[in-house]
Amino acid sequence: MKKVKILLTLFVVAFAALTSYAQEVLAPKPPKYPDGVYTKENTRTRRAIPYTHLREADVMWSKRVWRVIDLREKINHPLYYPDQIILDRKSLFDVIKDAALKDGTITCFDQPGIDDEFRYEMTKSEIDKLLVSWDSTATAEDPNNPGTYISAPVKNEIASISVWKYWVKEDWFFDKQRSVLDVRIIGLCPLVEKKTETGESTGADKALFWVYFPECRPVFANQEVYMRHNDAERRTFEDIFWKRMFSSYVRKESNVYNRSIVEYKTGLDALLESERIKNDVFVYEHDLFHF
């Protein structure tokens, strides 16, 4: 009975400490004095640029493409860093997580590996359960009985630094009303590295959830992204996606079998197939205005 009480005490203390730490990470303490020579107001009051109205009759051609944004590429680092929240910036994953868990302005959708059509809405408790787990195999020395080790569950949380890729679902289309080939992102899905029960890497990816991109745009428009060479002209996450300031590769295109590239190509052939799909879109646009 005594050991049970000690175990419960350690569990409660550890949970309280970790919860307090998590709150500090998610919401850093505001500074006593302004951190800068002027007050930044442009980003926090910005609004996402409305999409141009699109009629079905104006879409002459369209193709759905699924991409992968690898955050290990240098051009994609503004989406990955900072790995810890600071006063004026967050990583893309922290922005999504805060908006989903704290503000409720972004909806997450479950079963990302088999469904990307935003059908299985997740509650806040389901999101929290997905991102947080407890390791019940951890032990700690009994403070009242030195030399004796007892169970001490450890909280494991999926942090921003663990998210290394994103799936992007988007539609390319030709609008004859404006005579332009345009693209609109439909959804984003963060990926983490899949690990075994012992914590070893498997080399595979684990999809967390899908978010509907148009719903994310107002949130992204108010979050700064680091810009090299000039801190006074920083962009937002909305700018990054609107201006296509990221690198990616194609993992799937709309097809009769609904297959991903890796299901029928491997290795170098898969890379070449990805480039072929990208080139097909480029050639289509080029041929439209080639005389």
Would you name each region that the model predicts?
Residues 11, 157, 177-179, 200:
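Residues embedded in well-ordered secondary-structure elements
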Residues 23-177, 195, 215-291:
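A domain-level signal for the mature, folded cores of soluble proteins
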Residues 161-163, 183-185, 206-208:
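Extracytoplasmic
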Residues 169, 189, 212:
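Residues in well-ordered beta-strands of folded domains
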Residues 187, 210, 228-232:
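Short, low-complexity, polar/charged sequence segments that are solvent-exposed and flexible
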